From Swiss-Prot:
Keywords: Phosphoprotein. This is Protein efr3. It holds the Pfam family EFR3. PANTHER family: PROTEIN EFR3 (PTHR47766:SF1). It comes from Schizosaccharomyces pombe (strain 972 / ATCC 24843) (Fission yeast). One of its GO terms (biological process) is protein localization to plasma membrane. The gene is efr3. GO terms for cellular component: plasma membrane. Belongs to the EFR3 family. The modification Phosphoserine is found at S210, S726, S729.
């Protein structure tokens, strides 16, 4: 009788509920099938059915009729499946029903609620969330919040089952289009990621290691799931044979997979922010660091390549986030950045220079926040991983890791130059020493490889040959001896990476000056000029020791040719100013160099003369300097004592070299020792260059030189570095046999002085019958053959 006076849609709904059967939780099959047909036939009928079913479920819930609630949810699930084309008509009622049922403490009711929610998410493809209205979004957000509370497993009869149900709900959410960030749904990403973190993180190191192993063993096999009921609601067999704890962790990994593969970029970015803030609050322990690294690298691997940069920039912005306690001293966020940069996954679209400048500003702040003297900073930079403040060290390795993946050809060069600019001579000694530590790590990581003939390695080496002369200016511009020593040590390590060159006087004097040795020739002269200036500002004994190593290494690399540049430079560095008497300490290191040359060339007269010179200085020198084998650090101040005159003049040394070793030092090499042979960049003799002539130019591809080549190659040009550039001018050659003037021929004839100063590109090499080219013109070719300056990327403001 109770059905006679009811509307048809109400009758159809009520007939689906079993009558008089206690404990029954399944709806009547035939009435449910007809109800589905009736509701699907018309949208107004569906709206009425959904509204009445919702009121029926709420009524049953408030009267604690759990079985009827379960039946109502199953009816709702069937209607969602059958009426998916009109899902937007019933969406608000469905969500309100689920919101009521999610407040239950009965696990069976909660299970039916989650199943219905998963079905709703799976069949929501026909409707647009934007058409559901504000009421739907508000209720849906409350429902997500309710599922989040459920995933905590608090105040439940079975916490583990409760967590499992909550995670299944978030698995369904992150696999559907309702996962959003608009309006009232902006908290969904934070709920989703925190439900994963609170169920996968543990204070027990053993459990964290267990989760790490699970990620490594299972995450690689995950694939994007199709929009089906099996894909949205976790397959039943996924937990078969596993205990509930392992099943929970597997489901956490699955939700992470959904967030970074199936949600929109904004949802993913908001989730990442919450992930970073969660990890930032953890302690700096090895297990925690491993956990964070594994999770970050795995989600980076899942994330589409074009979106990976968003994860990185979320970490970068969190370096100074107000939501992180003591963000200016936090070490976990820099570690996350390091973990991403050091991973095998490259990040397309990464603006390397912008990132470097951002990291550099934080690096400077970290240096300035630590108060210490120069010697303390030097000692810390000797063992940076152990002694530098943790945050500072992590920021340092983040910068050096920017070159781990090559995003464009000139990336290494840009990073090196940016660091060099960041720590210019106007910055503090501490910042300069930290920058030099970065140089040390950069060149070690790039050059410390067995593939010496590889193209990238050759490119890096060629760049450093051009760049170190500028970076080495700290040898004499810095007022701090610790900065000078650190510069010398890093520069010496670079020299140790180079292989000995075949450059010799025969190469220089009897071949055209346009050779692949021009970069090496320029490098030798630039280095010798720095040595000259450095000798004038020596102040501690450690500088004495490291200079000895540098000049010895230059001889090992370039042989007697280096002597023609280094020895005159050392003699010029004996006097701090032009009219000052020579300093004893500068004389001592010069005497050591002469002894070293004599030993290598087996010229006993040079050895004995050098020792006599050194003995004559013994009364003015610390006894520790007289021990030639000593190479330990000593911060003892050097004496400023001077002598009236130099005991062993340069002319006497040069005469001895040419007389006793004519095969090594031919007579033509005498001019290279003279004052006039100084590098044109640092002498007034450039004013004597001849006027340019109007002659047809030709191009040369010999722009770079390579120190990493086999001895038999005679430094052939690197085809990978081939670049066409107008270097010099010659007369038109009508015959193949006509040759340009050699350096030896140019040296043999005087040149005509001119008051006109020419640029390197205006220098001419002429035939033997034409006017001879002065020595300086030939050496000046080095400058003309320097590589084209590296252009900044278009996104970098100049």
């Amino acid at each position: 009788m109770w059905l006679l006076f009811r509307s048809k849609h109400k009758k159809l709904v009520l007939r689906c509920f079993p009558s008089g059967k206690l404990g029954e939780t399944e709806p009547n099959g035939s009435p449910l099938a007809y109800l589905s047909y009736y509701a699907a036939s018309n949208s107004s009928k569906l709206r009425k059915v959904a509204h009445f079913l919702g009121s029926r479920v709420r009524h049953s819930y408030y009267h604690k009729r759990d079985n009827e609630v379960i039946i109502g949810l199953k009816i709702c699930k069937t209607l969602v499946q059958k009426c998916r084309d009109n899902i937007n008509v019933m969406a608000s009622e469905v969500v309100n029903m689920l919101l009521v049922a999610s407040s239950s403490k009965n696990l069976e009711v909660l299970s039916a609620c989650v199943d219905c929610f998963a079905t709703f998410c799976d069949n929501s493809g026909k409707g647009s969330p934007a058409t559901f209205g504000n009421e739907f979004h508000s209720a849906f957000n409350n429902l997500v919040n309710s599922f989040f509370e459920l995933s905590k497993g608090i105040d439940c009869v079975d916490p583990q089952q409760s967590k499992m149900l909550g995670l299944k709900a978030f698995h369904a959410l992150t696999a559907c289009k309702f996962a959003g960030t608009e309006g009232g749904m902006r908290y969904q990403p934070h709920f989703a990621i925190h439900c994963v973190l609170i169920n996968s993180w543990s204070e027990s190191d053993q459990e964290k290691k267990s989760f790490i192993d699970l990620v490594r063993s299972t995450a690689k096999s995950y694939k994007p799931l199709p929009p089906s009921s099996t894909g949205v609601s976790l397959p039943e067999h996924d937990e078969a044979g596993d205990n509930i704890d392992v099943a929970i962790k597997k489901l956490c990994i699955r939700i992470l997979f959904n967030i970074y593969t199936q949600t929109d970029p904004l949802f993913m970015a908001e989730s990442t922010k919450s992930l970073i803030h969660f990890f930032a609050a953890k302690s700096d322990t090895p297990v925690n660091l491993e956990y964070i690294s594994v999770v970050l690298n795995q989600i980076l691997d899942w994330t589409p390549v074009e979106l990976r940069h968003s994860i990185f920039f979320c970490c970068l912005r969190c370096l100074s986030s107000s939501r992180i306690v003591n963000s200016e001293t936090n070490v976990m966020v820099p570690y996350m950045i390091y973990s991403i940069l050091n991973s095998k996954n490259s990040i397309s679209g990464l603006s390397v220079i912008d990132v470097l400048r951002d990291l550099g500003s934080h690096l400077i702040n970290a240096v300035n926040s630590f108060d210490a003297d120069d010697q303390t900073w030097y000692n810390m930079c000797e063992s940076p991983s152990e002694k530098l403040p943790r945050r500072l060290y992590l920021l340092l390795v983040c910068i050096t890791c920017l070159t781990k993946h090559q995003y464009y050809d000139e990336e290494f060069a840009d990073v090196w130059r940016e660091i060099d600019t960041l720590a210019n001579s106007e910055t503090s000694s501490a910042i300069q020493m930290v920058a030099l530590t970065a140089f040390h790590k950069l060149q070690n990581e790039k050059l410390n490889t067995k593939k010496e003939s590889s193209a990238p390695l050759s490119l890096v080496t060629d760049f450093l040959l051009h760049s170190w002369p500028k970076s080495a200016e700290r040898l004499h511009t810095s007022q701090s001896p610790f900065v000078r020593i650190k510069t010398a040590e890093v520069f010496y390590e670079f020299l140790c990476f180079l292989r000995p060159s075949l450059i010799n006087f025969d190469t220089i004097l009897r071949k055209s000056a346009i050779t692949s040795f021009s970069v090496l020739w320029d490098f030798i002269y630039e280095t010798s000029w720095h040595i000259e200036r450095w000798l004038k500002v020596f102040s501690v004994q450690s500088e004495f020791y490291i200079l000895k190593l540098i000049i010895q290494r230059l001889y090992q690399l370039y042989g007697p040719v280096s002597v023609t540049a280094v020895l005159p430079a050392m003699y010029r560095g004996l006097r701090p100013f032009e009219n000052d008497p020579p300093r004893c300490i500068a004389e001592a290191v010069t005497a050591y160099y002469i002894i070293y040359i004599g030993e290598n060339l087996k010229i006993t007269t040079l050895q004995s003369s050098g020792r006599k010179w050194l003995d004559s200085l013994s009364s003015s020198l610390p006894s520790s300097l007289l021990n030639r084998g000593s190479s330990t650090h000593s911060w003892e101040k050097l004496t400023n004592a001077s002598t009236e005159e130099v005991m062993l003049p340069l002319d006497m040394v040069v005469n001895e070299l040419l007389e006793k070793s004519p095969k090594v030092f031919p007579e033509d090499s005498r001019l290279l020792f003279a004052e006039q042979s100084r590098h044109p960049k640092y002498t007034d003799i450039i004013q004597k260059l001849k006027k340019p002539s109007r002659e047809k130019s030709f191009t040369s591809s010999s722009e770079y030189s390579l120190p990493f080549i086999s001895p038999a190659s005679d430094y052939q040009q690197n085809p990978l570095l081939h670049a066409t550039k107008s270097l010099v001018s010659i007369h038109q050659q009508s015959q193949r046999g006509e040759m340009v003037s050699t350096l030896k021929q140019a040296l043999s004839r005087p040149h005509t002085a001119s008051t006109v100063v020419r640029s390197p590109s205006e220098i001419n090499l002429t035939r033997q019958t034409s006017n001879r080219v002065p020595l300086l013109d030939m050496l000046n070719l080095n400058r003309a053959m320097s590589p084209t300056p590296i252009q900044s990327p278009p996104y970098v403001r100049t």
